[in-house]
């Protein structure tokens, strides 16, 4: 599983990094995105949907860290 660590980064950087990871991934790959910017809670799911990918899991971890697991279901260009 590819991990995108956006802890300590604020909008719009987590979205930029998540998008780049999705663009560089192959269909079928799983990406884990970690962020602690409160805006990411809404921004990342919107990005995933916009790019046609699948949000497999979302959870709030300790210390305000948000964890998103995304499955790449189609190429992103």
From Swiss-Prot:
* Coiled coil ranges: none
Q: Where is the signal peptide, in residue numbers?
A: none
In this protein, the active site sits at 11 (cysteine persulfide intermediate)
Any Pfam family from its record, for instance, is TusA
Q: Superkingdom, according to UniProt?
A: Archaea
Family assignment from sequence similarity = Belongs to the sulfur carrier protein TusA family.
Q: What is this protein called?
A: Putative sulfur carrier protein AF_0188
Q: What is the lineage of its organism?
A: Archaea, Methanobacteriati, Methanobacteriota, Archaeoglobi, Archaeoglobales
């Amino acid at each position: 599983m590819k991990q995108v660590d956006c802890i300590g980064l604020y909008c719009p950087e987590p979205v930029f990094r998540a998008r780049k990871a999705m663009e560089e991934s192959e269909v079928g790959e799983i990406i884990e995105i970690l962020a602690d910017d409160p805006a990411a809670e809404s921004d990342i799911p919107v990005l995933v949907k916009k790019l046609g990918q699948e949000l497999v899991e979302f959870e709030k971890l300790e210390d305000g860290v948000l964890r998103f697991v995304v499955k790449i279901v189609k190429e992103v260009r």
